[in-house]
Amino acid sequence: MKKINLFLTLGILLLSAVIISSGCKKKSTTVVPAFTVTALPVTFQDGSLGLQFYGKCTNDDVKMTKVTIFDPISSSIPPFNCNGTYFVKNETFGLQDPTTGYNKQLGTWTFNFQGNRTADGVSFSTSATLSVTGK
């Protein structure tokens, strides 16, 4: 009789431990990469003013697919293809080919970043804005 009670007690304890441990699992939340954008003024060969944009992911390592840029009048510029390049957290990367730039327009520019997190391959699409002021 004592052996049966011992086995029942151990069985109940084991079952309770399994139920409690399965209920305590943390729910994983996928962190969406956050980007900041900066701009540098450039002068084109014809003397007109332009901008070169640079982005960086401030909270994750990423594999970038493309960046779609919208100028202040909400015109979509052809997407900048990042060719699946990997960037580590806080690594700055150009949002145009090295010898090109964008016509300078005052106002708020919008940047839609698309790619994958390198840690788990989860795809993302997130936006950042930059306000361009001055002459």
Q: Locations of the language-model features?
A:
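Bacterial N-terminal signal peptides that target proteins for export
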Residues: 1-11
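Bacterial Sec-dependent N-terminal signal peptides
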Residues: 3-5, 16-43
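Generic signature of intrinsically disordered, low-complexity, basic-rich segments
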Residues: 12-13, 111
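First exposed extracellular module after export/assembly in secreted or surface-exposed proteins
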Residues: 31-135
